[in-house]
Amino acid sequence: FLRN
């Protein structure tokens, strides 16, 4: 979720 950090980069999505």
Swiss-Prot record:
Locations listed in the record: Secreted
Major subcellular location class: secreted
GO BP term (any one): neuropeptide signaling pathway
Residue(s) carrying Asparagine amide: N4
Modified residues (3-phenyllactic acid): F1
Keywords: Amidation, Neuropeptide, Secreted
GO CC term (a single one): extracellular region
Free-text tissue specificity from the UniProt record: Neuron specific.
Name used for this protein in its record: Antho-RNamide
Taxonomic classification: Eukaryota, Metazoa, Cnidaria, Anthozoa, Hexacorallia
